[in-house]
């Protein structure tokens, strides 16, 4: 029987984000900049990662507390060996209605069919430019945008439902909004533009680099005829619009200018096995991995997860100002540990 629990701000728990690795084959400046994550950077050893059995056990307990959706993140999750094994395990859990995965897309041709066969049906591909030269400068690994576009075509050809995520930075890739919207509109693929966020400690974020949803919308309305779309469910993070001529939708994610803390229903498990109640959390999350490996029962695990959720009061984006960003004393967990 599913228990209905809420946090201190009255928010239910509906989603679980599982980071399966801290490794990535890109070095995007806003997430894993090359000067920080260089050749000598020490990533987590295998024994510091949760096993697939541990993840499935955690997901099963969370399902009993109301979680219906699971998203697999990283790092780059396709770098975790035998990920299809985890997908298959998660698909067997009662109450889990949706499993998604966020990826940079580079390894979709290599692993996509196995993941589909294991039950994965929905992926988000991160692609911050459609121009090859610009995209190479963003990922810092000489990967062309056309390479990822080919991977996306492959993913759709095998039956995966693909959405594309684009982090927009002022003066870097804001000129990509219109060409990317045009390209994916013609492909009938949903694209979502995300305001640049201050996740982690190494991405050089400040307010001047943010292109707000209103600015994006003004730009888009000069080129396309669109209508707003009503939210589909409580906690939906994107504001959706529909092209009038062919009905294809796109989204704008207002993570800075119009926060959605009040409807956030996500629990997050980092690649090193810690619980966090917020994408912008500090680095002292509850160590679920150590707790599980101490020999606790499922009932003890459930009680711990209940307690963690019921004391949750995170609302970082509601409280974000230039001063709070500058004065934040405690380091936030980096993106490669907690996913997007």
Curated annotation (Swiss-Prot):
Which positions in this protein are listed as binding [4Fe-4S] cluster 2?
261, 264, 278
Q: Which domain of life is it from?
A: Bacteria
Provenance organism: Staphylococcus aureus (strain bovine RF122 / ET3-1)
Q: Which PROSITE patterns does the record cross-reference, listed alphabetically?
A: MOAA_NIFB_PQQE, RADICAL_SAM
All copies of the Radical SAM core domain together span: 8-230
Keyword Glycosyltransferase on entry: no
The cofactor note from the UniProt entry for this protein is: Binds 2 [4Fe-4S] clusters. Binds 1 [4Fe-4S] cluster coordinated with 3 cysteines and an exchangeable S-adenosyl-L-methionine and 1 [4Fe-4S] cluster coordinated with 3 cysteines and the GTP-derived substrate.
Name the chemical reaction catalysed here: GTP + AH2 + S-adenosyl-L-methionine = (8S)-3',8-cyclo-7,8-dihydroguanosine 5'-triphosphate + 5'-deoxyadenosine + L-methionine + A + H(+)
Regarding protein family, the annotation reads: Belongs to the radical SAM superfamily. MoaA family.
Q: What is this protein called?
A: GTP 3',8-cyclase
Gene Ontology biological process: Mo-molybdopterin cofactor biosynthetic process
Q: Which sites bind GTP? A: 17, 71, 102, 163, 266-268
Cofactor(s) needed, names only, are: [4Fe-4S] cluster
Q: Which positions bind [4Fe-4S] cluster 1?
A: 24, 28, 31
Binding-site residues, S-adenosyl-L-methionine? 30, 75, 126, 197
- Entries under NCBIfam families matching the protein: moaA
PANTHER family for the chain: MOLYBDENUM COFACTOR BIOSYNTHESIS PROTEIN 1 (PTHR22960:SF0), MOLYBDOPTERIN COFACTOR SYNTHESIS PROTEIN A (PTHR22960)
> What Enzyme Commission number does this protein have?
4.1.99.22
Pfam families per UniProt: Mob_synth_C, Radical_SAM
Question: What is a GO molecular function of this protein?
Answer: GTP 3',8'-cyclase activity
Per the entry, what this protein does is: Catalyzes the cyclization of GTP to (8S)-3',8-cyclo-7,8-dihydroguanosine 5'-triphosphate.
Gene3D superfamilies referenced in this protein's UniProt entry, alphabetically: Aldolase class I
Encoding gene per record: moaA
